[in-house]
Amino acid sequence: MTALQALYREDFDHGRAIRLWLYVVAALVFAMVLVGGATRLTESGLSITEWQPVTGALPPLNEAQWQMEFQKYQAIPQYRQLNAGMSLADFKTIYWWEWTHRLIGRVIGVVFFVPFVWFLWRGWVPPNRRAGLWMILALGALQGAIGWWMVASGLADRVEVSQYRLATHLVLACLIYVAVVWTGTRWEDERVQPLLGKLYRTAQTMTVRAGAIGLMLLLLAQIYLGALVAGLRAGHAYNTWPLIDGGLVPQSSQLFFEVPLWRNFFENPLTVQFDHRMLGYAIGLLALLQLFNVVKLVKHGPVFASVLLVVAAVIVQVALGIWTLLSVAALPLALLHQATAMITLTFSVIHAAITIPPKVSARTEPSLQ
């Protein structure tokens, strides 16, 4: 083995270690989103009424501490208006959901920060990659603050958190997830990076690239709408399909009665659910169009495989969405619907990441496969 080959092998091993680290972080973010969904659906998110990033890592350890936490919860409107008479045992159930959600957030911070500092110290992170990783770390810190900002909205004058803040919290989590998966997928040397290949500058390939990015962005928008649906409990109304409020398209007087007009898109349960349905149909059509465009270029290889996964996931997700609606947002189906949304987003990120080739150097010739 030559010195150059040994150096390349060492760099490749470093890259493999960093990719593994990023995929572990992504798995933890995925888990946190699901636990966050369960916390929301079980209405557990207001059970911890304080934000203590360090000392809050420990749960109540004795009966006196549990009673103290319960008394804090009893002082907020949600308890007085919705859960008056709740037993301590029932309170513990909702408390553990929220505590677990926050604990995973703390674990993510440690799992990201400690190896990141180690990789930097060892010189394993190329200079052109560092800014992206620092940005992910900054977004993670911001997410903790936004999580408390969301919880705080339900502690004084409401019995639930603001749907605006809930949607912001979820979408930022998804943006962090996208950034981590994207970075891990593309953390490869040009010689092993899967590409569309020599056609990457043609109109057809640029169409595929645009379609991949478009799908990913629409899925993020759909997740935002899904959060509004959850925040407004819109999944507990208009539980028919394909009709909604008695028609394929509701009457405009019902869709747009809020003033000013823009509020309907965020505060009117009918409008929010209708938008969520329509965007789901649009994503399904775009996924099929993307498959058609990819097949015109390649019929095997990573790009083809990834678009098949996207299409399959979208179809399953649409079916699950309908089933969840008809079940009046039954908890197991609602959680499965959220999990499948994250899986669909994962496939779309991978598909987009491998359709965009790295810079081509003189030593590198992209492969169509």
Predicted regions and their residues:
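Polytopic transmembrane helical bundles with strong interfacial aromatic enrichment
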Residues: 1-369
